[in-house]
Swiss-Prot record:
This is Dipeptidyl peptidase 8. It comes from Homo sapiens. Coiled coil: none annotated. Changing residue 788 to A/S/V: Strongly reduced enzyme activity. It is found in: Cytoplasm. The active site is at residues 755, 833, 865. The gene is DPP8.
Amino acid sequence: MWKRSEQMKIKSGKCNMAAAMETEQLGVEIFETADCEENIESQDRPKLEPFYVERYSWSQLKKLLADTRKYHGYMMAKAPHDFMFVKRNDPDGPHSDRIYYLAMSGENRENTLFYSEIPKTINRAAVLMLSWKPLLDLFQATLDYGMYSREEELLRERKRIGTVGIASYDYHQGSGTFLFQAGSGIYHVKDGGPQGFTQQPLRPNLVETSCPNIRMDPKLCPADPDWIAFIHSNDIWISNIVTREERRLTYVHNELANMEEDARSAGVATFVLQEEFDRYSGYWWCPKAETTPSGGKILRILYEENDESEVEIIHVTSPMLETRRADSFRYPKTGTANPKVTFKMSEIMIDAEGRIIDVIDKELIQPFEILFEGVEYIARAGWTPEGKYAWSILLDRSQTRLQIVLISPELFIPVEDDVMERQRLIESVPDSVTPLIIYEETTDIWINIHDIFHVFPQSHEEEIEFIFASECKTGFRHLYKITSILKESKYKRSSGGLPAPSDFKCPIKEEIAITSGEWEVLGRHGSNIQVDEVRRLVYFEGTKDSPLEHHLYVVSYVNPGEVTRLTDRGYSHSCCISQHCDFFISKYSNQKNPHCVSLYKLSSPEDDPTCKTKEFWATILDSAGPLPDYTPPEIFSFESTTGFTLYGMLYKPHDLQPGKKYPTVLFIYGGPQVQLVNNRFKGVKYFRLNTLASLGYVVVVIDNRGSCHRGLKFEGAFKYKMGQIEIDDQVEGLQYLASRYDFIDLDRVGIHGWSYGGYLSLMALMQRSDIFRVAIAGAPVTLWIFYDTGYTERYMGHPDQNEQGYYLGSVAMQAEKFPSEPNRLLLLHGFLDENVHFAHTSILLSFLVRAGKPYDLQIYPQERHSIRVPESGEHYELHLLHYLQENLGSRIAALKVI
């Protein structure tokens, strides 16, 4: 028998029952707390009768789900994305630009390339809707589901790609060359370059190859778009799309059947860099070619080489793998060895006719660990605009120290086995050639890697200017324009000895704060800056007006003043700015309205080019309008006892009856780098929450301390103590809502989440079984020492230095604290999960069995960390609804408690 172990107290002490107020600051309806101090005890209220959800059979639930999801498929992936602006340069033509983008084709539901024309003038009395025109003729771009190669499957997991077709493309402005991967091939077409603009769909050209396996990560050479590079079997290859010449550049991987004997890769981002740092490539073309006296050129590629011989191999065995009876992965668990990494460079000598003369593989003049002492992760890399230096953003293992370094190509020498010849090559490099650390920062919390780094063309040989974003200075990510002096190192390689940590550091000449305040500049998941070097402006996305809305802003980076917002409040925006900074596209939505995509023209007075204003120009995708049978949630906030304002969403039951109290489901993520509560449309990704509300559940979502977009102090609250604070915030939010709404039944609360949300669902049942009746945990971490280095050590530190934190944060170690009543715990997990391995669930089950605790389990044999197979997704939602119905919401669930 399950009983409430104690009468719940209302910790937040708030009793304002006023109607919703629209706050001027946020531009979105938010139900706020009041200043009243009395607690509202449950016995002070009239006795309410419980509302029981209708009990459906499995087949009835299946039909109900099908009916509620009929608009869902239409909305998924409908919005265009990955925009590219190209000037038409036609003085007499009606169009100024052509924009290219990826979107879903109506014919075969695949992502493919489209374009639209931007008119030079518009009729302001009417709304112009741009027509979508297919750039490509129809061709088979996608294999049948389940036919992706292992490499493609894993990359799609890391990038969270759920659509089919073309996932991304590369474009070269000068030649008009498009390059993209589709199905098992790499293709190219030309449009918008010297040959003009097509009016008919183009037939893609297959890049022919001798490679027997899948080719990944194709990129155009920016210095010569006839050449492309790609990854084949963990090595770098190049190919000429005109002459069809193909060459393998690196030979580090041997394609051996035994993974233990074949641990090296070139040009490939390893698992942790992809999953935890959002870096998916491991090679970078130099933007400029070096000309040779004979009329040829030298092309360069900087790449990383990884040695994973000391990284543990994880084996996943399943009959569902069909031809592969076992899948094996290199997976560095926290506290164990990461891959050994170094930079190398490939130089390709091209003759005047465009043929390869020679390829030289080069390595650093000294070992990576000597030149870059204490560096564990290559977080980002690239080249300066002139190609004079490669640059890289480097992190130490604890992720509390960041360095930006410049690396001259002169720092690399040809790979040479002969010791004497190698020494001669080393001595030929001047002592003045060393790495240059142009920026360094440290923190006692952690450093969140982002994509904001803009290097200006060098105007002085001895200086370099760049824009970077930092959280370490104020606790909020802001933009800084930094000038570093490229000072020659005092370390002399020829004199022997090792460099000191400070030998390569360059002094900072000037550092200008471009933005400031208790809000953040966005720099991940597609958000980046656009720099207008002509007008000396920087465009960025941020949360200046509200932590719940993303907006586009502009400010001068030379004389920073007031930041100008360019997008409309009341919506959350994701923007793309043209290369000439004369147009921008915004994809925007709010809680009530599905996403819409619009084009805006930017202009400024002639006497003040820094004063930017926008003008609506055209619609690219109109909003679908309110969805039938969809009721958006209400956003609320409350002042937590921790001193922070916490935000949440409340889905009320659709047929709310007075005098009734309703079963409540807390949907949770609660981990870092995610924000669930914001002013965006939730009717697509989180449609199941609306379904629950339609069945008679109250649904609550709360962003606790540790979630993103609230500053480093807010996010860093669970440093060293994951799992120890999040449920306190969630419970306080539930208690606050119960103090405002008597229809919330705190005797019938369930919790559900996936990944970190699954982990916290377990924590909730373990820590507060007096509050949570049912927990449904999907793909949960149960033992932190089983999770990867990059994520776990960032937040929890090294396990040897935080044993108590790892113990308290691991539910498997505390299985005896779970309730002893059946029908309260359901675990869901994909058997092929390569991120949070199924071992997390199996070890928890072992400890639950030892402790004599009941549980229910649902395995998805074909799924990895994300559910991809449509039938699996439907089954998961059915199981979720059925379990909640049988064990929380229905009358039969109440009888089980008695």
